[in-house]
Amino acid sequence: MIRRYWNINLEEMMEAGVHFGHGTRKWNPRMAPYISAKRKGIHIINLTRTARFLSEACDLVFDAASRGKQFLIVGTKNKAADSVASAAIRARCHYVNKKWLGGMLTNWSTTETRLHKFRDLRAEQKMGRLNHLPKRDSAMLKRQLSHLQTYLGGIKYMTGLPDIVIIVDQQEEYTALRECITLGIPTICLIDTNCDPDLADISIPANDDAIASIRLILTKLVSAICEGRSSYIRNR
C-alpha cells in the first residue's frame, strides 16, 4: 500500500481538542504508549501518534475506495450523530447514527429482511398508497416506516456486509465492534484514553467526546475515501 500525504497537522488537531483524554482515574493502562502527559487530572494524548495512525487509516480507506469497497460509519451518541451522517453522506458511505440494533451484521439475513420491508414501505408511501388504506392500518404502517427510517435510514442502500467499518466511540459502539471482530471485518476506531487499543485493526488515539475532534478525524477519513472513489471511477 502506497503511503500518501493527507495534510494532517498537529496545530489543527490541538485547536480541535483531539489531545484531551479522560480523567487520569478513568483510563486503560494499555493506552499508556499513546499518552504523552497528565495535566490537571486529565491524560493528554500524544498527537504525533494520532497523526501516524490517522495517516495509516487514510491510506487504508483510500486504497479500499479505489478498489470499489464499501464502508460503514458507526457513531450513535448525540455528540457524534450529526457529524457521522454528514461525513457518510459526503463520501457515499453507509452509516448508523441512532442506535445499533444487536445482530445488525452478525444476523445479516434478519437485517436484510428489515431493509426489504423498509424499501417496500417507502415505495408504497411515495406512490401514496398508504393514504388509501383504512386509517388504523395507515397509521400503523407509517409508524413502522418512521421507526425503520430512524434505525436503518443510513444503511437503506446496503446490499451486503461492509468491507471496512469506521467506529467513532469504542465503548459506546462495543457491540458493533464485537460483531465486526466475529465476522473478520476490518475496523478503524477512534480510541480515547479509557479504551483498548488492541481491539481494532487501526486504532486512532483521539478525544472521542468533543464534536470538533470527532469531526476533524472523520473529515480526514472521508476526504481519503472521496479521493479513492474518484480514482476508482477514473480507472474503470
Swiss-Prot record:
Primary subcellular site in the record, as a coarse category: plastid
GO biological process: translation
GO molecular function annotations of the record: structural constituent of ribosome
Alphabetic keyword roster: Chloroplast, Plastid, Ribonucleoprotein, Ribosomal protein
Subcellular location field: Plastid, Chloroplast
Listed transmembrane segments: none
CDD domains cross-referenced by the UniProt entry: RPS2
GO cellular component: chloroplast; mitochondrial small ribosomal subunit
Ribonucleoprotein is among the record's keywords: yes
Keyword Nucleus in annotation: no
HAMAP family, per database record: Ribosomal_uS2_B
Family: Belongs to the universal ribosomal protein uS2 family.
UniProt-recorded name of the protein: Small ribosomal subunit protein uS2c
Gene from which the chain derives: rps2
